[in-house]
Design a protein with these regions (language model features):
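An N-terminal hydrophobic leader/cap segment in hydrolases
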Residues: 1-40, 44-51
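Active-site glycine-rich loops that stabilize anionic/oxyanionic intermediates
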Residues: 65-68, 136, 261
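Catalytic nucleophile-loop/oxyanion-hole region of alpha/beta-hydrolase
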Residues: 67-69, 96-127
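Conserved alpha/beta-hydrolase
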Residues: 70, 77-100
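Short beta-strand/loop motif that positions the catalytic acidic residue
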Residues: 251, 257-259, 263
Length: 294
């Protein structure tokens, strides 16, 4: 018997609890929830949320961050849809509903490859240019992905978490024992530690994800988001990622940084240092009164 696939509509309704925190016009309901799709590639069953807009001149690939998933961002995607834009939001494994086949290793390179493949697939459908929009660490994923795809015509990021900068690694970790000693151990003993799984709450300052304690608690307890246990291989490869194209040499497309003003997890100065090095057309907008998620 064929295995039935999980669904946010029928089997995993936790996301419905988030809706009360959003303005009524972008809340998800029976007639406004994203279309759910599945795609099997690279040893991954990839879950994708789609908010269609047939007349949209572009497609927006919305990339979640650590401790998130595509459905968590869907009210923001709904806002974009209401303005005429089609949005595609994949769940990057092991977050959300996506899952890997036996023997598939979950690491940062896999995430980038999946995103590039989604871009190629979407472009082949109708030739519409792609804009990548990344939230939290998804901002840097948007940058890495755009550096590999000629179809990306714009990058929008809420932060640039460049983990090649040791000060950035110290900033996002709960303490320097994790950011320095922990990283050193993962680098020395990948064969022993790569398959160990921990919650992102244990290796980051996830308690700073929003400026609303109730919403933060909801995200922290979400079994498809911050409560998901990730393999240390994903963390190790994320922390060791160097930009394949340095920002001074990046020529792919314009960049828009929309940075939360009240973001204690990744203060603006860290994103600004990367943003200032970009040689392309760029703009920075500060989201007044906002934290990293809301």
């Amino acid at each position: 018997m064929k295995k039935s696939l999980p669904s946010y509509q029928t089997t995993h309704p936790y996301w419905k609890q988030y809706q009360a925190f959003f303005p009524e016009e972008v809340r998800l309901g029976e007639h406004t929830a994203p279309q759910e799709e599945w795609w099997e590639l690279n040893g991954v069953h990839l879950h994708i949320d789609r908010l269609p807009a047939p007349e949209s001149p572009i497609k927006i690939l919305f990339i979640h961050g650590a401790g998130g998933n595509g459905r968590l961002l869907a009210p923001y995607a709904r806002m974009l849809q209401r303005h005429g834009y089609e949005v595609v939001s994949p769940d990057l494994p092991p977050y959300g509903l996506s899952y890997v086949m036996s023997g598939t290793r979950i690491n940062y390179e896999l995430w980038i490859e999946l995103l590039v493949s989604v871009i190629e697939r979407e472009y082949k459908k109708d030739g519409k240019p792609i804009v990548v929009l990344g939230s939290s660490i998804g901002g840097m994923l948007a940058y890495h992905t755009s550096a590999r795809s000629k179809h990306v015509k714009g990058v929008i990021a809420t932060t640039f978490v460049d983990t090649s900068n040791p000060e950035m690694r110290d900033q996002i970790a709960p303490n320097r024992l994790v950011s320095r000693v922990g990283k050193r151990m993962m680098d020395l003993f990948p064969g022993l530690l790569d398959h160990v799984r921990l919650s992102v709450k244990q290796v980051s300052r996830m308690q700073l994800i929003t400026n609303n304690q109730d919403l933060t608690r909801l995200i922290m307890n979400d079994p498809q988001a911050a409560a998901t246990r990730i393999p240390l291989e994903l963390l190790r490869t994320f922390l060791n990622k160097e930009p394949e194209v340095q920002p001074e040499q990046f020529t792919q497309c314009p960049v828009l940084l929309v940075h939360p003003e009240l973001d204690p997890m990744t203060p603006i100065r860290f994103s600004q240092s990367f943003f200032d090095r970009l040689a392309v057309d760029k703009e920075c907008i500060i989201l007044e009164g906002q934290a990293i998620f809301r």
